Amino acid sequence: MNIIISNNSSVAIYEQIKNAIKDAIISNELKEEEMLPSVRNLANDLKISFLTVKKAYDELEAEGFIKTVQGKGSFVAPKNLEIIKEEKLKEVQDHIEKIYNISKIANISEDEIKELFNMIFKGEI
């Protein structure tokens, strides 16, 4: 797993780490029960504070993506398909909200948006 962070991003560094690990889990790049780098090792590799990595790991654990075993390390949690579905559904919702906002500004009707969605689902676009 290769995590690339950007100091110029508006997204906090711990969020970038969290998102990269989540994406690796969802895409199956990281397998169930696979050990993650230790907090300190990842912090050293990324040249950032271990507290930043710890915050990312803590949030991933709270969200059910990883589990930490005292004295052994952090591991990819068994996949909860419902968690993954909720995560992706939220992502879709965010995109739909952006589409809605753009359509309001551009005075695009609901029917026009529905027609575009239908064409996309039918593979016509």
Q: Where are the regions a protein language model picked out?
A:
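A short alpha-helical element within helix-turn-helix/winged-helix DNA-binding domains
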Residues: 35-46, 60
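Residue cluster at the C-terminal edge of the helix-turn-helix DNA-binding motif
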Residues: 45, 59-65, 106, 123
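Key DNA-contact positions within bacterial/archaeal DNA-binding proteins
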Residues: 51
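Short secondary-structure transition/capping segments
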Residues: 46, 77-86, 113-124
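Short, cationic-aromatic polyanion-contact patches
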Residues: 14, 38, 72-88
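Beta-hairpin "wing" of winged helix-turn-helix
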Residues: 29-30, 34, 62-71, 77-78
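Extreme N-terminal segment that seeds HTH/winged-HTH DNA-binding domains in transcriptional regulators
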Residues: 1-35, 41, 90-93, 97-125
